[in-house]
Regions:
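Short, surface-exposed ligand- or partner-binding patches at beta-edge/loop junctions that are enriched
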Residues: 87
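Rhodanese-like catalytic fold shared by cysteine-dependent sulfurtransferases
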Residues: 1-35, 43-84, 92-131
Length: 131
């Protein structure tokens, strides 16, 4: 059995997904009716380091289910038409998640270069632990 290394999967995703900078995120979020920032990190990461104020938490394991209008778990408060800006801790998981959403048919999905830390470094406000 030959296992494809995760780094190769990430590299393949990065080659086709849209990657945006923290600066671009800031500009996009000036229009919150058309853009949503989604934190796909595990809940334990949010407990340990907080999240970005105004972002929506959608754990990686539920993302596809929560965004699929055909799913019984669909989150109706996030319209299909809204641009979805994903971030994780660095950008590996968000690249893979963005690719998966593209495979589902979303053409309005992208991820943040450098992930959570790049948003913090740029000056996004941190919201504390959800506990």
């Amino acid at each position: 059995m030959k296992i494809k290394p995760v780094k190769l999967l990430v590299d393949e995703a990065l080659a086709i997904v849209k990657t945006i900078t923290a600066s671009e995120v800031k500009s996009m979020l000036e229009n919150p009716d058309k853009n949503i920032l989604i934190d796909i990190r595990d809940i334990r990461e949010l407990y340990n380091s907080g999240t970005i104020e105004g972002s929506r938490h959608m754990p990686r394991g539920m993302l596809e289910f929560w965004l699929d209008p055909q799913s019984p778990y669909y989150k109706k408060d996030i319209p299909v038409e809204v641009n979805k800006i994903l971030f994780c801790a660095s950008n590996w998981r968000s690249a893979l998640a963005t690719k998966t959403l593209m495979e589902m048919g979303f053409d309005n999905v992208m991820h943040v270069e450098g992930g959570y830390q790049s948003l913090i470094d740029f000056g996004f406000k941190k919201k504390g632990s959800p506990i």
